[in-house]
């Protein structure tokens, strides 16, 4: 180990303070997904996980109800447009273009949002990187360390409230059954969320 381990046991939680004071409100990005954490959407291929990610991204970027209101608001606060970055390793730009139009014509049209306002909000708040046919963005080095690609990803996602890597399998070359490698990958991704 090249650097000394930080003593993670030097500052236990202040139980007295916690008991005597109300806890802060939890900051949810999506229901069940706290800010600065990592979550997974898992399922077999071709069940529309990417379309779900696009719909979530569009809703957050425009401040419109998530999935047309099927998913309730969080903490009763009004929704505001938020920056979202989608990194789609298996999607070509033309496919994303088709899907954006499909979502705009159904999801946003049903909410009666002005199309020009929606376009402006999406242009400002939604970053999509369609990487099909591009070089792999490998976030896990040979010794499970961070990579230069991870630093580029972190910079591309600065200020984003939600970042989606789809599918996560395309962002590393490790054996997904290797728990050490997957733990390192999860820690790297979590560090980008800070």
Model-based region annotation:
Residues 152, 156, 182-194:
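Substrate-engagement module of ASCE P-loop NTPases
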Residues 23, 143-146, 182:
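A conditional alpha-helix N-cap/helix-loop micro-motif detector
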